[in-house]
């Protein structure tokens, strides 16, 4: 659906000499745990490689997670969070354009409690949210955390989608063994946007549905979902900024900007994965994909750097 790529192109910030730092996106990633340090890094560095100006990472001090992340890239602003204290994160929300919650979050009660408070605070100020990884398992335990918030994008893989389906079925009293369709889940949750990742990426808000079936790669290395989460977050922030600051955008877009942004992100990841696989084949890892973002972005959006 190249038409959706065309719809997204105007939302890409122009590279102008009179812009100041932050105008092309202030993104945050909340995640990481003593087991998973790579996930928030993949999300954050992908955001910067795509073109966001600033990326914060809120990561726990437990297990040296935040310290490890600080050594991975000087371009990322890493905030060590002591004892999963949400008050270390919430004051920053007003300065952000989007927050991505979940990459490498883990399943500790402290991390989940902190994430819940951050999501609630983000909702209170109408901040766009992308939920990925263990943040999806968190909301499966309490759908009210996200229900009705149409500025949320969920990016479940197959296992996470099944958990989400089971939780929504319980909420609506569906006792069948059937897996709900993503459109039904999105509708039941108040028309939030869902990106069901798979052989084809199904993107829906319950009212409209699009499918990204661009060629990707057959290799299934860890970290691809984290790259997508950071990419979705960045592109969603750009679309929000575009409609906020452009006076000639009164016309309602053909699709919700959450769907347009998510589709563009899925298409870019698939394209970069394909390019990486052509070089590295079976040895392809997530950093190979990230290293293709620069050229891959120019392939899809050739006018964006002019």
UniProtKB/Swiss-Prot annotation:
Keywords: ATP-binding, Lyase, NAD, NADP, Nucleotide-binding, Phosphoprotein
Domain YjeF C-terminal: 4-300
GO biological process, alphabetically ordered: metabolite repair; nicotinamide nucleotide metabolic process
UniProt keyword Cell membrane present: no
Coiled coil: none
Top-level taxon of origin: Eukaryota
Pfam families: Carb_kinase
GO MF entries: ATP binding; ATP-dependent NAD(P)H-hydrate dehydratase activity
SUPFAM superfamilies from the UniProt entry: Ribokinase-like
Cofactor(s) it depends on: Mg(2+)
Reactions accelerated catalytically: (6S)-NADHX + ATP = ADP + phosphate + NADH + H(+); (6S)-NADPHX + ATP = ADP + phosphate + NADPH + H(+)
Family: Belongs to the NnrD/CARKD family.
The protein's name in its UniProt record: ATP-dependent (S)-NAD(P)H-hydrate dehydratase
């Amino acid at each position: 659906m190249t038409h959706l790529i065309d719809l997204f192109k105007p939302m890409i910030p122009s590279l102008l000499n009179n812009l100041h730092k932050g105008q092309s996106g202030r993104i945050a990633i909340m995640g990481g745990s003593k087991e998973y340090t790579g996930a928030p890094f993949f999300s954050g560095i992908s955001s910067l490689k795509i073109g966001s100006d600033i990326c914060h990472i809120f990561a726990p001090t437990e297990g040296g997670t935040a310290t490890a992340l600080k050594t991975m890239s000087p371009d990322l602003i890493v905030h060590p969070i002591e004892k999963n204290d949400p008050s270390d994160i919430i004051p920053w929300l007003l300065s952000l354009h989007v927050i991505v919650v979940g990459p490498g979050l883990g399943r500790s009660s402290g991390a989940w409690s902190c994430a819940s408070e951050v999501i609630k605070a983000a909702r209170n100020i109408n901040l766009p949210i992308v939920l990925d990884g263990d943040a999806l398992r968190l909301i499966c335990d309490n759908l009210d955390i996200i229900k009705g918030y149409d500025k949320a994008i969920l990016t479940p893989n197959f296992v996470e989608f099944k958990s989400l389906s089971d939780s929504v079925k319980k909420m609506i009293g569906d006792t069948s063994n059937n897996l709900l369709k993503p459109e039904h889940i999105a509708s039941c949750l108040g028309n939030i946007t869902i990106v069901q990742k798979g052989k084809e990426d199904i993107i829906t808000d319950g009212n409209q549905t699009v499918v990204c079936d661009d060629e990707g790669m057959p290799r299934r290395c860890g970290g691809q979902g984290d790259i997508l989460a950071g990419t979705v977050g960045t592109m969603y922030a750009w679309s929000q900024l575009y409609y906020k600051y452009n006076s000639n955008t009164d016309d309602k877009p053909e699709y919700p900007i959450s769907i347009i942004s998510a589709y563009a992100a899925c298409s870019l990841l698939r394209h970069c994965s394909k390019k990486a696989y052509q070089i590295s084949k079976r040895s392809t890892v997530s950093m190979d994909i990230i290293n293709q973002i620069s050229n891959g972005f120019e392939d899809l959006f050739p006018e964006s750097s002019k």
